[in-house]
Regions:
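Bacterial N-terminal signal peptides that target proteins for export
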Residues: 1-10
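Short, linear, compositionally biased motifs with a strong N-terminal bias
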Residues: 11-15
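Hydrophobic alpha-helical segments
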Residues: 22-215
Length: 215
């Protein structure tokens, strides 16, 4: 009996690990926002140009991660430059780049990250069935070879903190060195974004459903 209970506990623990983190929970009803929404008028004069640039390209404007980043204006400036490369100038095709981002959105159950990048991934050509399988917690079916590499590298790096020689050389053959490095770079950067969003308990825009229902 005890062995059966132990095996059941282990199985549940493994299952919990495999489906990733629990959904990022919204603030308690009536609780003040951890980081009140920053306005353009509150941003220092020497960061105004940066803020205007962000408003032009961000689907959430100064909300989401930027609301938190601007608490450290120099960091916001450096991060914006990094995101400019990783979003718009990376060697990875946009389809694969956005796939890598929503993988981290799924792993962190990041409400804003998934809300913002799921439609971008589909627009870039990622099959909806692949994105929906990912969100359901299963290995996506019918992935192309390059999508498989993006998924496997991202998952192994997140969950094992390394990748096997076999996967490394497979990824290098399919993506090439630059795309492989850019893949890991965008993945790590969007872990940072997810952590910032979790720090501030940032959610989907008001009136929009949460991609990951709070538990």
């Amino acid at each position: 009996m005890q062995n059966h209970l132990l095996k059941s506990f282990i199985a549940l623990s493994i299952a919990s690990f495999l489906v990733g983190a629990h959904a990022q929970t919204p603030p308690k009803p009536g609780a003040p926002k951890r980081f009140p929404q920053i306005t353009l008028e509150q941003i220092p004069p020497d960061s105004q140009a940066l803020a205007q640039e962000i408003i032009k390209i961000s689907s959430v404007g100064l909300a989401g991660p930027y609301n938190i980043m601007f608490r450290s204006p120099v960091y916001a400036d450096r991060m914006k430059k990094l995101l400019d490369y990783l979003r718009f100038n990376t060697s990875l095709p946009t389809r694969l780049n956005e796939f890598a981002i929503i993988i981290q959105g799924y792993e962190w159950k990041s409400q804003v990250e998934w809300y913002a990048h799921y439609p971008l991934a589909l627009k870039a050509g990622l099959p909806q069935s692949v994105a929906d399988d990912l969100k359901s917690g299963i290995r996506p079916r019918n992935m192309s070879p390059d999508e498989e590499v993006v998924y496997d590298v991202s998952m192994e790096m997140m969950r094992k903190h390394e990748i096997t020689d076999e996967l490394f050389y497979k990824a290098k053959k399919i993506l090439g060195e630059q795309q492989l490095v850019d893949l890991v770079a965008v993945s790590g950067t969007y872990v940072t974004v997810a952590m910032l969003l979790a720090l501030g308990q940032e959610m989907s825009p008001e009136g929009k459903p949460l991609p990951f229902p709070a538990q």
